[in-house]
């Protein structure tokens, strides 16, 4: 590979090739705005039931409240994660993960790499797990989670999830303190930076998230997505995959309402419960259909 080993595009390629060697199928990102790679349907449905799975994929993520109008050097409302899920977990999974860092030229000898206990919970999906954050020289770069529950169902067997924070890893690899200065890709004609691609988007999306999104319209969207998700679950032959997409859309709308400070702290819990109730119903129906 003649171009820069460290650029963002190559980082993705290296991880995809490495996890392919670990017998993971490489999936494509979900084409919906979601807050984390965990929301991908491969992870949600793949963790339910006894069937083994080994999968990896990149996922673009959106967290409207994290927008900073393109002015903050390391905080974004849109960013990338690389997700790995393996069920049942491999006994030496931490060592396998550390080898992936070595391929990125991040060695334990030259860096302070720590596994810091950090149990994880996602109330919206009725999911939680035990695990660790991985810190690289004091900065979190990865979340390790052993799922105990998803959709309110006990995970049997447990699934291990590894979530790489790609921007943070790339900033270390390229020795950059500003995410917008990262080299995304390059050839003999041109270097393309992260800022070239995403900084204007951060500015505009932040304006939309905090100032211009129509609150009344967002409330209407939320109710319609919830209504449609319920309807699809209650069909004689439920459309569970489609219903799941509707609750993901409702979840994103909820996050936009949160960014607009349109929901009080007491109301907030009610909105989360509406989504979680449907996520649990989808999980139960999916497990039942798999048993049949």
UniProtKB/Swiss-Prot annotation:
Which molecular-function annotations from GO does this UniProt entry contain? Answer: ATP binding; glycine-tRNA ligase activity
Q: What general EC class does the enzyme of this chain belong to?
A: ligase
* Cysteines joined through disulfide linkages: none
Write out the entry's keywords from A to Z: Aminoacyl-tRNA synthetase, ATP-binding, Cytoplasm, Ligase, Nucleotide-binding, Protein biosynthesis
InterPro entries recorded for this chain?
Answer: aa-tRNA-synth_II/BPL/LPL, Gly-tRNA-synth_heterodimer, Gly-tRNA_ligase_asu
**Which Pfam families does its entry note?**
tRNA-synt_2e
GO CC, sorted alphabetically, is: cytosol
Q: What is its EC number?
A: 6.1.1.14
Which SUPFAM superfamilies does the protein's record reference?
Answer: Class II aaRS and biotin synthetases
Q: Where in the cell is it found?
A: Cytoplasm
Q: Which reaction does it catalyse?
A: tRNA(Gly) + glycine + ATP = glycyl-tRNA(Gly) + AMP + diphosphate
What top-level branch of life does the organism fall under?
Bacteria
Q: Which GO terms describe its biological process?
A: glycyl-tRNA aminoacylation
Q: How does it assemble?
A: Tetramer of two alpha and two beta subunits.
Q: Of which family is this protein a member?
A: Belongs to the class-II aminoacyl-tRNA synthetase family.
Q: State the name under which the record lists this protein.
A: Glycine--tRNA ligase alpha subunit
């Amino acid at each position: 590979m003649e171009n820069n080993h460290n650029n963002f595009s190559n980082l993705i390629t290296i991880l995809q090739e490495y996890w392919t060697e670990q017998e993971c199928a490489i999936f494509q990102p979900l084409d919906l705005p979601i807050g984390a790679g965990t929301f991908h349907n491969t992870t949600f449905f793949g963790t339910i039931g006894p069937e083994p799975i080994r999968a990896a994929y990149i996922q673009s993520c959106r967290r409207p409240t994290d927008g900073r109008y393109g002015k903050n050097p390391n905080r974004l409302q849109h960013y990338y994660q690389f997700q790995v899920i393996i069920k049942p977990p491999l006994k030496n999974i931490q060592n396998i993960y550390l080898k992936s860092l070595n391929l990125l030229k991040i060695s334990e000898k030259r860096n302070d790499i720590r596994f810091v206990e950090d149990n994880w919970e996602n109330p919206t999906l009725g999911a939680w797990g035990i695990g660790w954050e991985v810190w690289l020289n004091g900065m979190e770069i990865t979340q390790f989670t052993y799922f105990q529950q998803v959709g309110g169902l006990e995970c049997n067997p447990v699934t291990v999830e590894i979530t790489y924070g790609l921007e943070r890893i790339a900033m270390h690899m390229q020795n950059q303190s500003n995410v917008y200065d990262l080299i995304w890709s390059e050839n003999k004609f041109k270097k393309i930076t992260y800022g070239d691609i995403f900084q204007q988007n951060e500015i505009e999306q932040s304006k939309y998230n905090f100032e211009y999104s129509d609150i009344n319209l967002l409330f209407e969207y939320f109710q319609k997505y919830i209504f449609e998700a319920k309807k699809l679950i209650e069909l004689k032959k439920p459309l569970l995959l489609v219903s799941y997409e509707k609750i993901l859309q409702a979840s994103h709308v909820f996050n936009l309402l949160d960014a607009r400070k349109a929901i009080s702290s007491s109301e907030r819990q009610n909105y989360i419960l509406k989504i979680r109730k449907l996520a649990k119903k989808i999980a139960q129906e999916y497990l039942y259909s798999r048993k049949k």
